[in-house]
């Protein structure tokens, strides 16, 4: 799978995802300037990185195409925990992944993780992040 696709800037909406500088980001705000006498309308996109939490912004013509990541949302079970990594097993394919706690776990759930619970994780561009704890 290519893990990314192209989408026209005018089709983007807040809450969707975009690649900025090779980093998958969630769009927070889009402002579109009106076209001038000698130019096309421009869109200013402000987004927050999924993995690093940094705020990024870009300005592009609304007719331009940008890369959008394909995010695979799956369920896994926590098999083992070490001080700096979490080992998870996919519930469908039974593949094992080692996820670093610092960059691969959402801040809201870092203290709630324990062995044996099910979690939802996102995989995109060869990277994994545990996003939330799944209910039983």
Swiss-Prot record:
Keyword field contains Cytoplasm: yes
Keyword annotations from UniProtKB, A to Z: Cytoplasm, Hypusine, Initiation factor, Protein biosynthesis
A Pfam family matched in the record: eIF-5a
Cytoplasm is among the record's keywords: yes
Cellular component per GO, a single term: cytoplasm
GO biological process: positive regulation of translational elongation; positive regulation of translational termination
InterPro entries: IF5A-like, IF5A-like_N, NA-bd_OB-fold, Rib_uL2_dom2, Trans_elong_IF5A_hypusine_site, Transl_elong_IF5A_arc, Transl_elong_IF5A_C, Translation_prot_SH3-like_sf
Subcellular location: Cytoplasm
SMART domains documented for this protein: eIF-5a
A molecular function (GO) term: translation initiation factor activity
Annotated family: Belongs to the eIF-5A family.
PANTHER family associated with the record: TRANSLATION INITIATION FACTOR 5A FAMILY MEMBER
Protein name (Swiss-Prot/TrEMBL): Translation initiation factor 5A
Species this protein is from: Thermococcus onnurineus (strain NA1)
Gene: eIF5A
